From Swiss-Prot:
The gene is myd88. This is Myeloid differentiation primary response protein MyD88. One of its GO terms (biological process) is positive regulation of gene expression. The keyword NADP does not apply. It comes from Salmo salar (Atlantic salmon). InterPro entries: DEATH-like_dom_sf, Death_dom, MyD88_Death, Myelin_different_resp_MyD88, TIR_dom, Toll_tir_struct_dom_sf.
Length: 283
C-alpha cells in the first residue's frame, strides 16, 4: 500500500461495493487449502455461534464486514488488511491493492471537502424541504424541528408492546418523548431519508424491540445498523435492545455486545420500565 495513506485510521466504510464484492469472490467459497470468510470472522472477534449463523447467508463476507463495522470501533481498513495477512490471504490484498487505495483516497477527499453550510448555521436544523415538516409537531415554516428522547425500532407485530411502552414512559412521571413512526411521522416522504434524519438528528437514543419478526425486517435491520454506525462500540449508550417475549430464533449477533432490557424474566418485570426510563433519561 502507498506510504502516503494511513490505513489504520481510515474506517471500513471507506470501502465501496466493488471492493466488498471482490472480497466475497475470494472469501465466500469454502476452501480446504486457503483460509475463507470463517477464518476472517474469527479474527474479527466473532464467536463460534455467530459464525455458524452466518453460514446461511448468501454473501457471508458482506455480512461480517457490515456487522464488524457496526459493532467494533477498531474496524479500520488497516486492521482488515492485517487480518487478511494473519490468515495467509496475501493474494487477496495484492489483487485488490489498487482498488482499496482508490477507495481510501476518495474517502479522504470527501472528508476534506468544505461543509455545505457556513459555521454560523446550526446544522441540527434541517435545511432541505424533504427534512422539514416530517413529524406532527414540526414547525411547517422550517423552524426548530421536533426532538425526541428515543426512536423506537419495531415491527408491526410488536405494536401492542410499543403502545404499552408509550403509556408507561410518556404518560407517567417519566414524561419521556418517544418517536413512534406510525404515530409521529407524516405520510408522503422517503422512508429511508426520514428515518436516518430522525435517528441521527432528532432522537438522543434508539430502543430496539427484539422479536422473531424483527430478524426478518429490512427496515429494522437498516435502522439498527445505521444507529450502531453512529456510536461504534456503544460509547454513547445510544442503542438499547428490549426483549419482551420469548424467541425461537437466535438473538441478533450484532446486538449481543449490548446490555439487554429483558421483559421476559418474571423476577425483573417490576424493574423493567424504571430501568428503561432511567437509561433513556441519561444526558
Amino acid at each position: 500500500m502507498s506510504t502516503s495513506l494511513d490505513l489504520w485510521n481510515i474506517p471500513l466504510r471507506a470501502l465501496n461495493i466493488n471492493v466488498r464484492k471482490r472480497l466475497g469472490l475470494f472469501l465466500n467459497p469454502r476452501n480446504t487449502v486457503a483460509s475463507d470468510w470463517m477464518s476472517v470472522a474469527e479474527n474479527m472477534g466473532f464467536s463460534y455461534l455467530e459464525i455458524k449463523n452466518y453460514e446461511d447467508c448468501l454473501d457471508p463476507t458482506r455480512r461480517i464486514l457490515e456487522d464488524w463495522q457496526a459493532r467494533c470501533p477498531g474496524a479500520k481498513v488497516g486492521k482488515l488488511l492485517s487480518i487478511l495477512d494473519n490468515v495467509d490471504r496475501k493474494d487477496v490484498v495484492e489483487d485488490l491493492r489498487d482498488l482499496i487505495e482508490e477507495d481510501c483516497r476518495r474517502y479522504i477527499e470527501r472528508q476534506n471537502e468544505p461543509p455545505l453550510q457556513v459555521p454560523e448555521v446550526d446544522s441540527c436544523v434541517p435545511k432541505t424541504q424533504e427534512r422539514q415538516g416530517i413529524t406532527l409537531e414540526d414547525d411547517p415554516e422550517g423552524g426548530i424541528p421536533e426532538l425526541f428522547d428515543a426512536f423506537i425500532c419495531y415491527c408491526q407485530s410488536d405494536f401492542d408492546f410499543v403502545h404499552e411502552m408509550x403509556q408507561q414512559l410518556e404518560q407517567t412521571d417519566h414524561k419521556l418523548k418517544l418517536c413512534v413512526f406510525d404515530r409521529d411521522v407524516l405520510p408522503g416522504s422517503c422512508v429511508w431519508t426520514i428515518t436516518s434524519e430522525l435517528i441521527e438528528k432528532r432522537c438522543k437514543r434508539m430502543v430496539v424491540v427484539i422479536s422473531d419478526e424483527y430478524l426478518d425486517s429490512d427496515a429494522c435491520d437498516f435502522q439498527t445498523k445505521f444507529a450502531l454506525s453512529l456510536c461504534p462500540g456503544a460509547r454513547s449508550k445510544r442503542l438499547i435492545p428490549v426483549k419482551y417475549r420469548s424467541m425461537k430464533k437466535p438473538f441478533p449477533s450484532i446486538l449481543r455486545f449490548l446490555t439487554v432490557c429483558d421483559y421476559t424474566r418474571p423476577c425483573t418485570q417490576s424493574w423493567f420500565w424504571v430501568r428503561l426510563a432511567r437509561a433513556l433519561s441519561l444526558p
